[in-house]
Design a protein with these regions (language model features):
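Boundary at the C-terminal end of the N-terminal hydrophobic targeting segment
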Residues: 9-14
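Secretory pathway targeting signatures of secreted, lumenal, and periplasmic proteins
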Residues: 26-79
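Solvent-exposed coil/turn segments that connect beta secondary-structure elements
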Residues: 50, 61-63, 102-106, 136, ...
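Surface-exposed amphipathic alpha-helical segments
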Residues: 23-31, 136-167
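Hydrophobic h-region of N-terminal signal peptides that target proteins for export
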Residues: 1-7
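Extracytoplasmic
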Residues: 20-22, 26-28, 38-42, 51-53, ...
């Protein structure tokens, strides 16, 4: 479900995303709604422009937190050790797991993350991801993946967005 904040021009509107029916997450107006590339994605946004644009996806998900973090990290190879970080914070009704990874990204093409298809290596890529884990076991993912420069330039906005569920 996507709602729009009233009283702003369309260029300035922030989007409010429902997270597991427990809280709203406010998406920065600079993150532009985009066509979903997969049916399992609930919301997709474009961050940046042209070839430097990154992809922000949001969806409900299953599996454990540790398994999903391991899978996300496994999609990357190389990268500086100091850029590979995981932190956990409390945000509203969620335990929020933030994950940063850089390096060469193995992007699935055509099959989605669980169904195979061909893989394309994207050099100098980064991801900042968030797993919203609720006490009842529900999980919601937000992932920003793209050229490292774009992801790093928008990391603070992404983290603020994920923590907005606590406001």
């Amino acid at each position: 479900m996507m709602t729009f904040t009233a009283g702003k021009s369309s260029a300035e509107e922030a989007k409010a995303i429902d997270v597991l029916g427990k809280a709203k997450m406010t998406v920065p107006s600079e993150f532009k709604p985009s066509e979903k590339k997969s049916r399992i994605i609930e919301h997709e946004f474009k961050v940046g422009e042209g070839d430097a644009a990154a992809r922000l996806t949001m969806m409900r998900a299953g599996g454990g937190v540790a398994q999903n973090i391991k899978r996300w990290k496994g999609q990357f190879s190389g990268g500086k050790e100091e850029d590979q970080k995981t932190e956990t914070v409390k945000a509203g009704p969620f335990e929020l797991h933030l994950v940063d990874v850089t390096g060469s990204f193995a992007e699935s093409m055509g099959g989605g993350p669980f169904f195979g298809g061909r893989t394309v290596q994207r050099e100098n890529y980064a991801m900042v991801g968030a797993i919203f884990a609720s006490e009842d076991g529900g999980m919601y993912f937000a992932k920003l993946v793209g050229p490292a420069e774009t992801v790093k330039a928008n990391r603070e906005k992404f983290v603020e967005m994920t923590k907005s569920v606590g406001k």
